[in-house]
Amino acid sequence: MQIPIKKTLDRIPGGMMVVPLFIGCLMKTFFPDALAMGGFVTALTQASPIMAMFFVIVGAQMSFKEAPKAMWRGSVLTGVKFATGVAIGLFVAKFMGDNLLGISSLAIIAAVTNSNGGLFLALTGQYGSKTDSGAYVVTALNDGPFFTMIALGTAGIATIPFSAMLSVVIPIIIGMIIGNLDEEMREFMSQGSSKIIPFFSFALGTGLTLKMLVAGGISGIILGIITAVLGGIILIIADKVTGGSGIAGAALSSTAGNAVATPAAIADVDPTIAAAAAIATPQIAASTITTAILTPILTSFWAKKLEKRGIDPTIEK
């Protein structure tokens, strides 16, 4: 008996990404010990090695001529995402008494300015062009507390180690060298990009739990909607300004898991916001879960809209 698993996943918006991620989340929530038994089972929960392989594959699809375009797109999208989060946060702080339906400016800035790098790679790998995926070299900068600290006036405390930057760039450069030296190797490696998406989607899911969603409550879900929908629309427009299809912009409309630690990092610097940080942390966790669902749906929706117009988003203009 045959079960049409792939056809079912294809019918779900972002299904190849969302379903494995949700399965991983359910496993982490209800059967955490099963994932910690060791060996190859636990290895399936490690996203980093799979993402490293994906970086090499992405690099192999890029010609040296396309690299500056990817850097430009990544820079614009990163800047716009940062500016969007800061603008909304400052508006809430200045004109709404630092309270938007129970959400503080700290929570808004931390959630909206950070993005889930693994989710971005999976979605651009499935729906976007190689330039879209290559933009990750720059968009990776917003995965953490650095930009949030800048926004809150504490940039002197936060640093991004140079070695961390190199660790992102080197696998992509290795892939670029291989792909530019041998067209057959480029073609061979291109066949692997879509195959590994469900695997690191599952691994990303094992870093989330449904408890995060419950703890954040309705306000955390609203924060996720603001990040994915409002932020996503702005990012799609910004992406198109760079000559892109909008896929990279939609794929960047998430909240990074690392953002959950941002309020505590800020509170260590400025203890006066410790109370706000305690409330913001579960809200950001809920936003992470919410955007992990909404961002793939938004990206899939936009990809289908482009296809109806006769535009193939996987092909760069």
Where are these regions (language model features)?
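Entry/N-cap segments of selected transmembrane alpha helices
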Residues: 42-47, 62-93, 144, 208-239, ...
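Membrane-embedded alpha-helical segments of transport systems
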Residues: 80-88, 112-117, 133-154, 255-263, ...
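Juxtamembrane helix-boundary/capping and inter-helix hinge elements in multi-pass membrane proteins
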Residues: 62-72, 95-103, 113-135, 141-144, ...
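Transmembrane alpha-helices that form the ion-translocation and gating core
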Residues: 75-114, 221-271, 298-306
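Hydrophobic transmembrane alpha-helices of secondary-active transporters
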Residues: 19-30, 42-73, 172-182, 191-216, ...
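Hydrophobic alpha-helical transmembrane segments in multi-pass integral membrane proteins
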Residues: 28-29, 87-94, 148-157, 203-217, ...
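Structural signature of hydrophobic alpha-helical transmembrane segments
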Residues: 38-54, 100-114, 159-173, 218-230, ...
